[in-house]
Amino acid sequence: MTKIIQISDPHIVAEGKLAYGQVDTSSALKQCVAQINKILPDIGPVDMIIVTGDLTDFGTSDEYNLFREIIEELNIPYRAIPGNHDNKSVMQKCFEDTDWMPKIGPINWEIDFQDLKVIALDTSIIGTAHGNLETASLNFLRSALNSAKEKPVIVATHHPPVMTGIEKMDIQNLRDSDELKEILSTYKGELKLICGHIHRNIVTQFGNVICQIAPGVSHAVTIDLREGSPNCLTKEPGNFLLHEIRDGILTHQIPVDDYDGPYLFYPE
């Protein structure tokens, strides 16, 4: 029964700095790591952590090194894909010692478990906030799905290919997604698409597959569905997702912050 934790959009900045002058993203990721370590006996074993983009805020080597220093306090294998805030070439250099980071080209990878296949796709474009999938990435997806042999599949991207109603984020989402939808629709087994970027837990349909957008671990994009609304963040509690194979792909949301309990409903 494979279990995957999804962490999204940590936005690590230089130590001692605040993202957007407001958010201590390093402390938030440290708290996320502490929370996972704390509850691991209750939810584990966890097979892998996937970070769905925006590991850093400015894509510097110092930020990536700090990200690694924090995330590697977990004794769980992890992999990542870039988001629009990441610098692909710097990211590749900072993770060149790992067995999953491609040396050149899009940062795509796949991994097979006994009852699940995870396919991760690079949607980032240097110099732009919105996402797109290169032909090489679409071909990578086709090949990976062909080898999945109808076992459950999770496909991960940073940019979601759906509209959320949050106008300033929707213009930054994945563009030209029709080919992605067509490829996913041909898969005969169960398939779930997981994304980041929006910093909110949103579930919708993309063609014939479920698409789930993960919340951020440190801050949220403000939910403002009015036309012309400003692009804002709110300091909502951070969360991460746990995906597991249990009569299909099941997803739990877990808060980053510490909390009281557990308490018996009916203590003796």
Predicted regions and their residues:
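Active-site neighborhood of phospho(di)ester-bond hydrolases with catalytic His/Asp-centered motifs
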Residues: Q6-S8, M48-D54, Y78-N84, D122, ...
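Extended active-site neighborhood of metal-dependent phosphoesterases/phosphodiesterases
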Residues: S61-S143, D176-G189, S229-I245, L250
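His/acidic metal-ligating clusters that form di-metal
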Residues: C32-M48, H130-I210, L241-L242, I249-L250, ...
